[in-house]
């Protein structure tokens, strides 16, 4: 074993003492900094939880604006939401309903998340919301999101719209007394089946389901609506000629067919300003069935429309296929608007007259208007988002 060299006996002790002194001087501040870091991390985590909770409140308010709009404003949630153990209070305000606003409204959402220690974070968000508006669509006699075919000696007294004018196919004897417009002239936002379904479901929720078949002969009084048919529906008349009057919305989830009754059992449908909404196909292919009165016939699928048109030309009827073809060949002059998503085909001898739908009492989404009932939301944009 090596012997200890002269003058080295006290060096180790001195070094140990120096380390202990320096460590004592630096350890306390270092531990203090570590404690401060832990505390700061806890504060940061709490503020982050508050921010997430306040953000969740804004998202919940947006859902309410889109799906369960309040009746009056400003609207304050009756009970705070509990998110991340924070109480979240939410207030929704809206600009006054003004017919000049078009299809948009502005909303303010104030969402405040408060912790147990009284600390809070607030998000102040301003939104612009667009609502379903068929006004531009109803300004035309014929509308298609794809192609239009006009045959024979068809006469159209009104404007025609489709995305590309080159997709308008007409025979040489067709007369169009109006303007042919496409996407370059006017932009039309095509509505979806879901938007229509949401809008008309409000009219019929919890109402009568007539079953898969009705005979007008057995109805007393001869009125229908509001009806909600969970499936398909066939309508016939085996009795004497009669008139069927719509009193409210008819909503059919499946297909709806007005069965050809024969001349001795003919009947008339008075639309009476109401709407027939069909989730599948719609068929009314018999001139033994007459139609009069303003109203709407809207089907998600195909439409076969060949009734006898009666009236004085002052009624406005919307016949619309949302995703399918519209085959149109009625007897008599038609007044209103014909719409098809993939194809609109008018047969020879049809005369279509467009008049203004204003004042006809149509139950269709027309933007915010001056009605308390708002149509489905079609767009939502965040104008500002402030955190405090």
Residue ranges and their predicted role:
Residues 2-145, 149, 161, 358-363, ...:
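Beta-strand/loop motifs with alternating small/hydrophobic and polar/acidic residues, enriched
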Residues 3, 17, 104, 171, ...:
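Exposed boundary/loop context
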Residues 79-82, 243, 289:
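Short, exposed beta-strand/loop patches in secreted or surface proteins that constitute
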Residues 99-234, 238, 257-263, 281-294, ...:
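Short, ordered "entry" segments at domain starts
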Residues 242-247, 265-271:
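Beta-strand repeat architectures
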């Amino acid at each position: 074993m090596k012997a200890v060299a002269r003058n080295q006996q006290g060096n180790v002790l001195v070094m140990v003492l120096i380390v202990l002194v320096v460590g004592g001087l630096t350890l306390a501040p270092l531990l203090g900094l570590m404690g401060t870091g832990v505390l700061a991390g806890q504060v940061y985590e709490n503020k982050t939880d508050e921010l997430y909770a306040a953000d969740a409140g804004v998202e919940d308010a947006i859902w309410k604006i889109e799906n369960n709009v309040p009746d009056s404003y400003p609207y304050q949630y009756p009970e705070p939401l509990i998110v991340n153990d924070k109480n979240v209070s939410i207030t929704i305000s809206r600009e006054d309903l003004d017919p000049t606003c078009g299809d948009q409204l502005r909303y303010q959402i104030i969402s405040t998340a408060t912790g147990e220690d009284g600390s809070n974070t607030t998000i102040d968000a301003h939104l612009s919301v667009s609502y379903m508006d068929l006004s531009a669509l109803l300004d035309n006699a014929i509308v298609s999101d794809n192609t239009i075919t006009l045959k024979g000696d068809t006469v159209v007294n009104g404007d025609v719209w489709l995305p590309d004018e080159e997709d308008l196919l007409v025979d040489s004897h067709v007369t169009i007394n109006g303007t042919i417009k496409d996407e370059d002239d006017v932009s039309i936002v095509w509505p979806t089946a879901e938007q229509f379904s949401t809008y008309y479901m409000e009219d019929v929720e919890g109402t009568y389901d007539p079953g898969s078949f009705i005979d007008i002969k057995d109805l007393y009084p001869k009125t229908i609506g509001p009806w909600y048919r969970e499936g398909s529906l066939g309508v016939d008349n085996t009795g004497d000629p009669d008139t069927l009057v719509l009193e409210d919305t008819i909503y059919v989830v499946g297909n709806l067919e007005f069965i050809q009754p024969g001349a001795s059992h003919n009947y008339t449908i008075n639309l009476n300003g109401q709407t027939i909404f069909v989730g599948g196909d719609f068929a009314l292919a018999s001139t033994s069935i007459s139609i009069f009165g303003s109203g709407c016939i809207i089907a998600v699928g195909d439409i076969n429309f060949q009734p006898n048109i009666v009236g004085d030309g002052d009624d406005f009827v919307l016949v619309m296929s949302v995703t399918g073809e519209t085959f149109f060949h009625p007897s008599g002059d038609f007044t209103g608007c014909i719409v098809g998503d993939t194809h609109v085909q008018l047969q020879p001898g049809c005369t279509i007259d467009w008049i203004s739908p204003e004042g006809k009492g149509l139950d269709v989404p027309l933007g915010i208007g001056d009605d308390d009932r708002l149509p489905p939301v079609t767009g939502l944009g965040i104008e500002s988002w402030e955190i405090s």
